[in-house]
Structure formats: structure tokens, C-alpha cells
Amino acid sequence: MHSEAEESKEVATDVFNSKNLAVQAQKKILGKMVSKSIATTLIDDTSSEVLDELYRVTREYTQNKKEAEKIIKNLIKTVIKLAILYRNNQFNQDELALMEKFKKKVHQLAMTVVSFHQVDYTFDRNVLSRLLNECREMLHQIIQRHLTAKSHGRVNNVFDHFSDCEFLAALYNPFGNFKPHLQKLCDGINKMLDEENI
């Protein structure tokens, strides 16, 4: 028999927090010299809410807590590494030009995600999947000189999941279980668009 303390501990450890994860990833990447403030500036509250919702929908879809955590951890690590490279002027001119194209493509993706949610009967999983895979290819090119094969594997892990047409169809099913998640995701993405953070 479990005591109340043990049960509350189990519930507490079941909570996923992308903000804390971002701080952990930042510390691992840059070692002891880096403060928490860098990670918190890279992953703001709105981004954190979107990441938490992505975790919840991924966990519910995969029915696998470890897999969902791995996908979101890989997403956070990729975002942080990319931001560190960018902020420390590690990209050459070609990579910077590609980075600008990547930012525009991510913005287009965000607008499409929200539009497909807001306008009935416009959702096309192939369009979203294609946009996600275009982002993946650009990202691989941007980080090619800078990050390891393991990092490229993380990128693939993230995009393999989110660009999967079956996942996208489940997420956008107007009668499905994911409708509340999609609403929260789009609310967060809309806020990021308004704040020009995406």
C-alpha cells in the first residue's frame, strides 16, 4: 500500500516542465560557467507553454512518456544549440543566409499551423508535413559544420515525429481527443507570432 506522501511524490515526478529542461540542457551544453538566465532567455514563458503542450499531445499520441520526453528534450537541445551558435557569431555568410530562410520558413509553418486550425476544412497534412521537412533539411544544412551526428539524429527524431502525417491527422481531427491541445498550441503560437518570437 502506498502512503499519501509516496503518491504525491509520484504525481510530482510525473509533471513535465520544459522550462526546467531548457535550463538543464543549457547547463550541460555550456558547463558550469553558464547561468540559468541564458536558458530562460532562450525559452521564454510562451515558448515554454507551447513546448509543454507539445509534450502533452506527444505523450497522449504515443502513449509513451519516455518517448515524448525524449522528443521534447531533443527539440529543446536543438533550439538552444542553434541559438548559442547564432549568438556567438559561429555561422559563415552562407549559413547566415540559410538561417534567415529558415526563420522565414518557421514563421510560414507557424502561420499555417494556426490557419489550418482557425479556418474549417483547410487542413492538409501533406502541406504541414512538407513544411516541417523543409525546415528539417535547412536545419541540417545550417548545423552541418558545427554539430555532431548525434545532434543531427536529434533533429531527425523531432521532425520524424512532428512531420508524421498520421500524427498531424490525429492532431487536427475536429472530433478527436487532441482538439483542446491544438487550441492551446495555436493560442501559444499566435502569441509568439504577435510578439514576433517566431
From Swiss-Prot:
InterPro entries: TNFAIP8-like, TNFAIP8_sf
Taxonomic path: Eukaryota, Metazoa, Chordata, Craniata, Vertebrata
Principal subcellular localisation of the protein: cytoplasm
The keyword Hydrolase is assigned to this record: no
Segment forming the signal sequence: none
Family (UniProt): Belongs to the TNFAIP8 family.
Entry protein name: Tumor necrosis factor alpha-induced protein 8
Localization terms from the record: Cytoplasm
Functional note: Acts as a negative mediator of apoptosis and may play a role in tumor progression. Suppresses the TNF-mediated apoptosis by inhibiting caspase-8 activity but not the processing of procaspase-8, subsequently resulting in inhibition of BID cleavage and caspase-3 activation.
GO terms classed as biological process: apoptotic process; negative regulation of apoptotic process; positive regulation of apoptotic process
